[in-house]
């Protein structure tokens, strides 16, 4: 009887392990939250051993976090036939300008960024001590110990330290990029975002820009300078063989960290 019970228990346990896991709707329909300005904050999945050794994941064109915004078409209000040429649905202000004001509007940003930083520090420290004592005399005669050593000393000590450090850094970028308005804030400011990809011989180059602007800073030709963009985040880099050659290899990074 015990043997039959044991066989039944083993069979039941083996059957449970062979059952396939049931995927719940939460797992099947799970999505990641994408920030409108900074991009996808979810952990990037490695595409293979090459990306693992390189220690970085290259951006790709068509990233949903940088996708353009397409505003929904608003339905037109029904208007009765009045026989008049005036239509409320197609009303436009005679004195209105063409500055972007809504989600999906396009604006050109003029990139003109120049930063220069330099720092230097100099230190020169010195210290010296000089102390001496003449031999002691008693009755016009030097006082000596054992007839050989007198009571006198001469001490000299000096310390010198010199340090010099300097650091310089400069960056410059110029060009144009056309972005879109992705959000209109309550105070009227516009949140913009956009990217531009250039495919060259053995790699791609891209420019990404995001930030917040004021409609008053937009010029008459629908452009705005990059130094007028608040919380600006500008990325200019590339992918491909040339970009990989600018970085040290896996072994070089390993020895640099370990040593």
From Swiss-Prot:
InterPro entries named among the record's database cross-references: Flag_Lring
Pfam name, any one: FlgH
Residues with lipidation of kind S-diacylglycerol cysteine: 16
GO BP terms: bacterial-type flagellum-dependent cell motility
Signal sequence bounds: 1-15
One Gene Ontology cellular component: cell outer membrane
Lipidated sites in chain (N-palmitoyl cysteine): 16
Keywords of this entry: Bacterial flagellum, Cell outer membrane, Lipoprotein, Membrane, Palmitate, Signal
GO terms assigned for molecular function: cytoskeletal motor activity
Bilayer topology term: Lipid-anchor
Localization of this protein: Cell outer membrane; Bacterial flagellum basal body
Keyword hit for Transcription: no
PROSITE patterns: PROKAR_LIPOPROTEIN (PS51257)
Quaternary context: The basal body constitutes a major portion of the flagellar organelle and consists of four rings (L,P,S, and M) mounted on a central rod.
Function: Assembles around the rod to form the L-ring and probably protects the motor/basal body from shearing forces during rotation.
Family the UniProt entry places it in: Belongs to the FlgH family.
UniProt xrefs under HAMAP family: FlgH
Name the UniProt record assigns to this protein: Flagellar L-ring protein
Species assigned in the record: Vibrio vulnificus (strain YJ016)
Gene giving rise to this polypeptide: flgH
């Amino acid at each position: 009887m015990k043997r039959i019970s044991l066989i039944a228990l083993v069979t039941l346990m083996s059957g449970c392990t062979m059952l396939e896991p049931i995927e719940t709707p939460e797992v099947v329909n799970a999505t990641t939250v994408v920030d409108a300005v900074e991009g996808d904050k979810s952990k990037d999945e490695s595409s293979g051993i090459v990306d693992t050794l390189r220690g970085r994941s290259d951006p790709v064109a068509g990233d949903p976090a940088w996708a353009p915004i397409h505003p929904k078409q608003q339905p037109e209000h029904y208007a009765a036939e009045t026989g008049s040429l005036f239509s409320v649905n197609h009303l436009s202000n005679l004195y209105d300008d063409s500055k972007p004001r809504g989600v999906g509007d396009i604006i050109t940003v003029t990139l003109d960024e120049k930063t220069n930083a330099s720092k230097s520090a100099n230190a020169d420290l010195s210290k010296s001590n000089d102390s001496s004592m003449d031999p002691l005399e008693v009755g016009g005669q030097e006082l000596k110990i054992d007839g050989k050593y007198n009571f006198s000393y001469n001490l000299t000590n000096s310390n010198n330290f010199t340090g010099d450090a300097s650091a310089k850094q400069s960056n410059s970028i110029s060009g144009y990029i056309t972005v879109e308005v992705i959000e209109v804030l309550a105070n009227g400011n516009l949140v913009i975002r956009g990217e531009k990809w250039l495919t060259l011989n053995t790699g791609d180059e891209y420019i990404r820009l995001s930030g917040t602007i004021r409609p008053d800073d937009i010029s008459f030709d629908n452009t705005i300078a990059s130094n007028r963009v608040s919380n600006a985040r500008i990325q200019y880099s590339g992918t491909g063989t040339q970009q990989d050659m600018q970085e040290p290899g896996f072994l070089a990074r390993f020895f640099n960290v370990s040593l």
